[in-house]
């Protein structure tokens, strides 16, 4: 057996101990976790010992420590301090206390004045300062140890502006809580100059939660589009007060800038019809996010709200979610910087933390998908640059997502998954509406019944049937109320106030105006109209004219004055042509002594007077002793006889009608006739669309008519159509009213008639308050009724009456050129033909005479023409063949003639 020396044993034992200690140190070193402290500074809250942000801060640190996924070798601890609100001195003191303990980052506080004090210290000592609420940021902040997880309000302001543009608002009221609200909404406040937007800015009361005086002013000013910049707690109180004041109706639309709108209890408002829109940054569609929020709710870490606060219990607010994400973002930077250690820092020594700059850079470079979506920062100013907002809106099921917004793509409105409209008031189903109307036959009238009737059953008429059809299509119920002052609606020239149904729509006393309410420009400026359900125009209602007996000279009436003038001209023309042709035609000259065929004298009976006599005899159908002999003159005579036959026959036929019927003569035939006289008074319904038309018209005729009506306002303007109709029946009065009503009245009163055509063109529409969500639905329903033909059927039902007997025309129309102008053409053609025939006869006879007299054709023609043109002579010598005699006989003949001719001596 070998013996080991004691010295060697001690050496081996010593080495074994060293190896064991080294192994133990290595094992200890590998199993040791790094401890890192975060600091949190939070304000005291009234609801409990800890606010939502502090609870979320602790909840996030504990979650990271439990999971060990993000920081497997690091254990986080925290130091939280409480300060009073707005106490920046205390905030600075607490920050210095935490820095002396050694913290890697400071979270909070939330209020801007306290946060600025803490940030100043963190900048000096190089410690990251993490914010989760909005704080006004200076433009140059590149060296700041600061990041904010709250979305930049310049982006939020653009999101709100995009919503305003999407809803097509023209007027907006901005209500803010404190002065920082004006800074946050700078993009919106600058919008009026660029987007033609009228902006009104109001501030909530500072020392009280009572917003009723402000809401009362807004209600009086009819401010229906409102943007509230306030906390969700204050928003809940405002909604409760608005409900009590009747401002939670479909005409109001509220946009809230708070990202905690989903935390409000909206159960009392679901069926009110109010439009409520806001944004949400919590990514609730992510399953991991939903599980964390559910765990938060189950652990009930947050103190429950007060019973009357209007807030939901168990919801993680946006501030809490942002604080939860802030802790995780800083932890991501810690994971990337394992060699980082914290050290105690003293505020009075101004010695910065040596790892601060690197750690701050890692925080700004960090990326994290948290409860509030993607988180990235601007490396220069530390602001959050990438985020998504859900657009949420109140529906009957509660607040639902209707779209998204992000800084890059802007607003993207999406349809509801259930296929429901984005706005709650787009649906009229099961809604109860107040309908204002006016008694106007046949549109609205009391139903005749032996039993007493109540409610809507009291009324019937065209508009009542229309309202019933609209109710069936859209599914709403209604209550009919007669307008209090019995007027349609007109604006007072002095104070600009409206009356009638228009006023009730402006004041939201009624939801619809279903009546014969004309769509006009001035009304469209204060209320909205649907598409017209009836098209019409202004016309004149007047008594039917009395009949008059034929006058002394009524025998002239069968032919128009133009025809009488043309007949006279035709008579003169035919007579002259007959005279000329008769003298021109050789065959119209005859031997006046038939017993002496050797006579060289011929005669022409168609002198100028005889030609006129021939025409008169034919025209009077009496004939004359003159008979044309030549073909040309016979053509003239025949055409003239044919002409007189047609004229006399037409005259005789039309004369019977003129002498046997009464003539209906109206003193006016158009609006121009009314304007040119003052004997017949005329007017319209006071404060109606017809009166407004004449009042606003720039056309000279209508302006003159309005001057007449306004000068006799008390006597010519009536209160209703019924009064105007009675005045027409009982006095010399013309009533200006809508053509459809005139059509209805004249069907039932045969003593009335419409004078002239339409003065203008317009339509009746269903009136709604300005900006009403019901208008488009009403319009679509009206178009549907029009396509189905139901509007026409309803009009036939109410306009068709017993009717007046069909009246035959009580005044025959005088025959004009368009009736018998053709006979003048035939007459002219006959005259032209006769001229050509006469020329032919003349040439033919001249040729024969030239051959007979052994002379040239031209000389014979000239001689014949010379004799024909001597209009004063009825006789001329007949041409004879030349006779050859001896000279002595000629001398003897001249001697004989000289003895018989008188004046021989004078001539010699």
Swiss-Prot record:
Q: In which tissues is it expressed?
A: Highest expression is found in the olfactory lobe, piriform cortex, dentate gyrus, hippocampus, granular cell layer of the cerebellum, and in caudate-putamen.
Result, substituting residue 886 to R: Abolishes sumoylation. Loss of kainate-mediated endocytosis
Chain ranges on the Extracellular side, renumbered to this chain: 32-561, 660-819
Position of the signal peptide? 1-31
Q: How does it sit in the membrane?
A: Multi-pass membrane protein
Which residues get glycosylated?
67, 73, 275, 378, 412, 423, 430, 546, 751
Additional facts recorded: The postsynaptic actions of Glu are mediated by a variety of receptors that are named according to their selective agonists. This receptor binds domoate > kainate > quisqualate > glutamate. It does not bind AMPA without coexpression with GRIK5.
Task: Name the protein family.
Answer: Belongs to the glutamate-gated ion channel (TC 1.A.10.1) family. GRIK2 subfamily.
What post-translational modification does the entry describe? Sumoylation mediates kainate receptor-mediated endocytosis and regulates synaptic transmission. Sumoylation is enhanced by PIAS3 and desumoylated by SENP1. Ubiquitinated. Ubiquitination regulates the GRIK2 levels at the synapse by leading kainate receptor degradation through proteasome.
Q: What is its main location?
A: membrane
- The molecule here is called Glutamate receptor ionotropic, kainate 2
Regulation acting on activity, per entry: Cold receptor activity activated by temperatures between 10-19 degrees Celsius.
User: Per UniProt, where does L-glutamate bind?
Assistant: 516, 518, 523, 689-690, 738
Where in or outside the cell is it found? Cell membrane; Postsynaptic cell membrane
Q: Does the keyword 4Fe-4S apply?
A: no
Q: From its record, what is one biological process in GO terms?
A: negative regulation of synaptic transmission, glutamatergic
Q: Name one Pfam family in it.
A: Lig_chan
Crosslinked positions for Glycyl lysine isopeptide (Lys-Gly) (interchain with G-Cter in SUMO1)? 886
SMART domains for the chain: Lig_chan-Glu_bd, PBPe
């Amino acid at each position: 057996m070998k013996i080991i020396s004691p010295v060697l044993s001690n050496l081996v034992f010593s080495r074994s101990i060293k190896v064991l200690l080294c192994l133990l140190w290595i094992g200890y070193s590998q199993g040791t976790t790094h401890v890192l402290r975060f600091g949190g500074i939070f304000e005291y809250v009234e609801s409990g010992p800890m606010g939502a942000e502090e609870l979320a801060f602790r909840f996030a640190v504990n979650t990271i420590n439990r999971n060990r996924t993000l920081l497997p070798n690091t254990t986080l601890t925290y130091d939280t301090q409480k300060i009073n609100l707005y106490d920046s001195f205390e905030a600075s003191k607490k920050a210095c206390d935490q820095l002396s303990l050694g913290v890697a980052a400071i979270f909070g506080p939330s209020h801007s004045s306290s946060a600025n004090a803490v940030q100043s210290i963190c900048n000096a000592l190089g410690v990251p300062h993490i914010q989760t609420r909005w704080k006004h940021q200076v433009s140059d902040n590149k060296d700041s140890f600061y990041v904010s997880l709250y979305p930049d309000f310049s982006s939020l302001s653009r999101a709100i502006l995009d919503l305003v543009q999407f809803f097509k608002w023209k007027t907006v009221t901005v209500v803010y809580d404190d002065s920082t609200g004006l800074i946050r909404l700078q993009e919106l406040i600058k919008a009026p100059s660029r987007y033609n937007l009228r902006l009104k800015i109001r501030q909530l009361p500072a020392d009280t939660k009572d917003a009723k005086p402000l809401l009362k002013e807004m209600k009086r000013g009819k401010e229906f589009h409102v943007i509230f910049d306030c906390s969700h707690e204050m928003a809940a109180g405002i909604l409760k007060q608005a409900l009590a004041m009747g401002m939670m109706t479909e005409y109001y639309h509220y946009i809230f800038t708070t990202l905690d709108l989903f935390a409000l209890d909206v159960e009392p408002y679901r069926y009110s019809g109010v439009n409520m829109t806001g944004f949400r940054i919590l990514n609730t569609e992510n399953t991991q996010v939903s599980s964390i929020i559910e765990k938060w709710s189950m652990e009930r870490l947050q103190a429950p709200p007060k019973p009357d606060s209007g807030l939901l219990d168990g919801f993680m607010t946006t501030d809490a979610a942002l604080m939860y994400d802030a802790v995780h973002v800083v932890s991501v930077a810690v994971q990337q910087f394992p060699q980082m250690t914290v050290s105690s820092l003293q505020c009075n020594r101004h010695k910065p933390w040596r790892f601060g700059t690197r750690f701050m850079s890692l925080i700004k470079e960090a990326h994290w998908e948290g409860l509030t979506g993607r988180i990235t920062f601007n490396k220069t100013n530390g602001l959050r640059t990438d985020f998504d907002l859900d657009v949420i809106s109140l529906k009957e099921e509660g607040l639902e997502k209707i779209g998204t917004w992000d800084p890059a793509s802007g607003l993207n409105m999406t349809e509801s998954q259930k296929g429901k409209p984005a706005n709650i008031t787009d649906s009229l189903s099961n809604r109860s509406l107040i309908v204002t109307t006016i008694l106007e036959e046949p549109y609205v009238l009391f139903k005749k019944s032996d039993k007493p009737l109540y409610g809507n059953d009291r009324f019937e008429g065209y508009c009542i049937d229309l309202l019933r059809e609209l109710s069936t299509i859209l599914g709403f119920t209604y209550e009919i109320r007669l307008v209090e002052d019995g007027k349609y609606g007109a604006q007072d020239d002095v104070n600009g106030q409206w009356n009638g149904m228009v006023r009730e729509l402006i004041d939201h006393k009624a939801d619809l105006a279903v009546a014969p309410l004309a769509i006009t420009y001035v009304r469209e400026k204060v209320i909205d109209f649907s598409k017209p359900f009836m098209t019409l125009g202004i016309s004149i209602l007047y008594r039917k004219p009395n009949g008059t007996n034929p006058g002394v000279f009524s025998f002239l009436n069968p032919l128009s004055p133009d025809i009488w003038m043309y007949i006279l001209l035709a008579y003169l023309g035919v007579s002259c042509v007959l005279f000329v042709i008769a003298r021109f035609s050789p065959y119209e000259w005859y031997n006046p002594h038939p017993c002496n065929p050797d006579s060289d004298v011929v005669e022409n009976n168609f002198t100028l007077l005889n030609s006129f006599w021939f025409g008169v005899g034919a025209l009077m159908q009496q004939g004359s002793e003159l008979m044309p002999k030549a073909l040309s003159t016979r053509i003239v005579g025949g055409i003239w006889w044919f002409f007189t036959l047609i004229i006399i026959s037409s005259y005789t036929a039309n004369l019977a009608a003129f002498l046997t019927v009464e003539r209906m003569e109206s003193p006016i035939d158009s609006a121009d006739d009314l304007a040119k006289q003052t004997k017949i008074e005329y007017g319209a319904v006071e404060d109606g669309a017809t009166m407004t038309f004449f009042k606003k018209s720039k056309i000279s005729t209508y302006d003159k008519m309005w001057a007449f009506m306004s000068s006799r306002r008390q006597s010519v303007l009536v209160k209703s159509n019924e009064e105007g109709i009675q005045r027409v029946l009982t006095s010399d009065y013309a009533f200006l009213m809508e053509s459809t009503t005139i059509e209805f009245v004249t069907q039932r009163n045969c003593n009335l008639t419409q004078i002239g055509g339409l003065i203008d063109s317009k339509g009746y529409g269903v009136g709604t308050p300005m900006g009403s969500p019901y208008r488009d639905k009403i319009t679509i329903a009206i178009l549907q009724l029009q396509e189905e033909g139901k509007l026409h059927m309803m009009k036939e039902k109410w306009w068709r009456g017993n009717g007046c007997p069909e009246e035959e025309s009580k005044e025959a129309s005088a025959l004009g050129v368009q009736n018998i102008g053709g006979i003048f053409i035939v007459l002219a053609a006959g005259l032209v033909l006769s001229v050509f025939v006469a020329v032919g006869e003349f040439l033919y006879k001249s040729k024969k005479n030239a051959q007979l007299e052994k002379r040239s054709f031209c000389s014979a023609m000239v001689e014949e023409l010379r004799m024909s043109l001597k209009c004063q002579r009825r006789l001329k010598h007949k041409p004879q063949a030349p006779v050859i005699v001896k000279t002595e006989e000629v001398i003897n003949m001249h001697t004989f003639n000289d003895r018989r001719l008188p004046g021989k001596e004078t001539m010699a």
